[in-house]
Amino acid sequence: MLDLLIELLNRDVTQAVDYFYANDVQRQIVQNKVTAINETKALALFDKYKKGAVIDEDQVFEFYKDLGIDMETDIVTFMFSYNMQVKDKQLVMGEYTKEEFIQGCKNLGVDDLAGWKGKIATMRADLKNDNKFKDMYKFVFGFACEKGMKSIDIDTAVALWPTLLGNRCKFMDKWVSFIQEKAEKKEITIMTKDTWDLFFDLVQ
């Protein structure tokens, strides 16, 4: 599979995209299941961590620290962020807006810190569900994009892949080395969503 993807990338990214769709790989659409919550309590929780109008990177770290989660190494944080999606709006890595945080509370059916803690086991179980993990993986691409961008830089991609897929991909080191060599030669300068998504399916 690695050889196939390398061959496709060496030819043309368009061919990789054609392969992606020809094999009936379907993109998943997130369907939020909204649960009634005490929105006043949820807003109070947001206010506890917000800095200005958003929960910024430092405060996001504090939020997950209070949940007993290491934000730097535990990918369950991506699953929580995945559940904070607001329709037609792209989340920004390292911050949660009020709208996103409250949406996450509604989607998970929680309105306080204890409720969030109670969902950790569920989020970990979702990481073991292939379909949910795939949805989360695809979400991370947009999550990692800078505002207004439709691609991510190579350094970000090669940092995220081992974290997300290290336990699933036997050839991760070779893949990362290949991408880094391509980047050093200026043969690739960005990572597109199509290649990001295709890599997941080849890993499977």
Task: Give the positions of each predicted feature.
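Short, amphipathic alpha-helical interaction segments embedded in low-complexity terminal/linker regions
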Residues: M1-A121, K128-N131, I152-D155, A159-V203
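Conserved, structured regulatory domains from eukaryotic proteins
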Residues: T122-C145
